[in-house]
């Protein structure tokens, strides 16, 4: 700290530069007016640098990254779990025809995965090409909108959470009634921290492999394994100054569940147990925008381990050319994830700090209600509303709408991903008439970029 008593007899005013790295002291000694200038090691740090761990918005911003990483595992696995539950609710559906699906990525890691893991994973069926029941593909998609809030505490500000995502998947049934598939998720999380403008904007891309396997007549095991890539934009606003940061991350996650269905008169009761697990790594980053106040964050590892028990209830109604199937979900979850910590320092002075025991472990209740609509034409619909409520009062509301479509033998689909841009192509041949439809979407563009193209032609 600075002691100016030996240099100024009558201090009448103190001022700081805009970045807080310079302090000016006005001394009135008799008629001699003197202004002294002092260089500070960090912004506005006259005695000591401002301790970020004592600022509720700073603490909340750090907690938000840990919470968002754990929520990402839930938001990525829920659509796949919904799909596996849908498959078992409708396991009597026969495959209509064979389809051809291709996956292309410009990312070298994902492209390598698609060329090595996908063929091995999706061809391990020992099924005959002449057996349509065991060789047809099904495409599905699910869009999710989620809103939530985590209240303030004695050390942390409140957080308002908005999440939107789309999941695209493909699966097929094997000879032993085993369903295997893959899913791609594109998501965006926006979290507002406190009341001064601090925020986290997180964009994610996830690739999931999943399998649902029978263990008898009515007992099934579901498991999935996946990888997500994370890019975050962070704003830390104190009201008078604001800093910005960019952070990348990777996440490995998995889930295993066991379900046993009890049926009577088209009414199904399915108790289940489930374990979710995962590890997230966030890279180090340095804030910009306020010299003297910018913080430098070390890399961080976040563990996730959640167990849950619950049940599903559904009942089938057979209507003309369609089936209507309403259902209800209930789950009780115990979060036993280990605590994590974040180390950081002022980039100007190097003063170091650590936020320990970042632990969002809690107990929560998950409820959901929705319905399936299954038509003979090949188009099927699933809608679902869910709510996650913790014992501490935080919550998440989700609305889900998903589609499934199976087309004719002469139909082909192609899905390609180029950085954040996605392209879906559909081609169909009817006698000598060919129909090509291509749609592209950049999910994370500031100004959404999208297009759809239709081509109809004949070959003779």
Annotate the PLM regions:
Residues 47-91, 95, 99, 133-460:
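Membrane translocator/pore-forming domains, dominated by Gram-negative outer-membrane beta-barrels
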Residues 1-5:
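A short beta-strand motif characteristic of beta-propeller blades
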Residues 16-19:
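Residue-level detector of Asp-centered blade-edge/turn motifs that repeat once per structural unit
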Residues 37-46:
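Short loop/turn segments immediately following beta-strands, especially the blade-tip
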Residues 28:
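Short loop/turn segments immediately following the C-termini of beta-strands
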Residues 10:
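Beta-rich catalytic cores
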């Amino acid at each position: 700290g600075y002691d100016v008593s030996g240099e100024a007899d009558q201090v009448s005013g103190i001022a700081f530069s805009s970045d807080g790295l310079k302090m000016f002291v006005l001394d009135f000694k008799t008629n001699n007016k003197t202004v002294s200038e002092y260089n500070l090691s960090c912004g506005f740090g006259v005695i000591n640098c401002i301790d970020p761990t004592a600022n509720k918005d700073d603490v909340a911003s750090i907690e938000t990254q840990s919470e968002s990483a754990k929520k990402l595992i839930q938001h990525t696995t829920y659509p796949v779990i919904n799909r596996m539950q849908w498959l078992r609710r409708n396991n009597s559906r026969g495959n209509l025809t064979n389809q051809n699906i291709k996956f292309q990525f410009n990312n070298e890691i994902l492209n390598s995965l698609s060329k090595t893991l996908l063929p091995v994973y999706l061809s391990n069926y020992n099924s005959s090409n002449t057996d349509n029941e065991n060789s047809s593909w099904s495409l599905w998609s699910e869009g999710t909108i989620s809103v939530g809030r985590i209240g303030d505490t004695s050390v942390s500000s409140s957080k308002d959470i908005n999440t939107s995502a789309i999941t695209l998947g493909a699966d097929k049934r094997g000879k032993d009634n085993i369903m295997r598939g893959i899913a791609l998720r594109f998501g965006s999380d926006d979290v507002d921290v406190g009341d001064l403008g601090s925020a986290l904007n997180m964009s994610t891309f996830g690739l999931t492999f999943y399998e649902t396997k029978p263990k008898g007549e009515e007992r099934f095991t579901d498991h999935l394994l996946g990888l997500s890539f994370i890019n975050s934009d962070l704003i830390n606003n104190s009201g008078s100054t604001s800093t910005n940061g960019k952070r990348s991350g990777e996440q490995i996650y998995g889930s295993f569940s066991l379900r046993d269905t009890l049926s009577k008169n088209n009414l199904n009761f399915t108790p289940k147990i489930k374990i979710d697990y995962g590890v997230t790594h966030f890279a180090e980053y340095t804030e910009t925008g306020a010299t003297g106040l910018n913080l430098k964050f070390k890399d961080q590892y976040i563990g996730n381990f959640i167990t849950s028990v619950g049940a599903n209830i559904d009942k089938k109604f057979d209507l003309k050319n369609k089936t209507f199937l309403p259902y209800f979900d209930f789950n009780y979850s115990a979060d036993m994830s280990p605590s994590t910590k974040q180390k950081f320092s002022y980039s100007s002075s190097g003063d170091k700090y650590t936020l320990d025991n970042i632990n969002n472990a809690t107990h929560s209740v998950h409820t959901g209600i929705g319905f399936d609509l299954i038509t003979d034409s090949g188009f099927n619909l699933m809608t679902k509303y869910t709510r996650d409520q913790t014992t501490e009062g935080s919550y998440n509301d989700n609305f889900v709408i998903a589609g499934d479509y199976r087309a004719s033998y002469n139909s082909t689909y192609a899905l390609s991903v180029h950085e954040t841009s996605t392209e879906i192509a559909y081609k169909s041949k009817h006698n000598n008439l060919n129909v090509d439809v291509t749609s592209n979407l950049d999910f994370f563009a500031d100004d959404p970029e999208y297009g759809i193209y239709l081509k109809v032609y004949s070959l003779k």
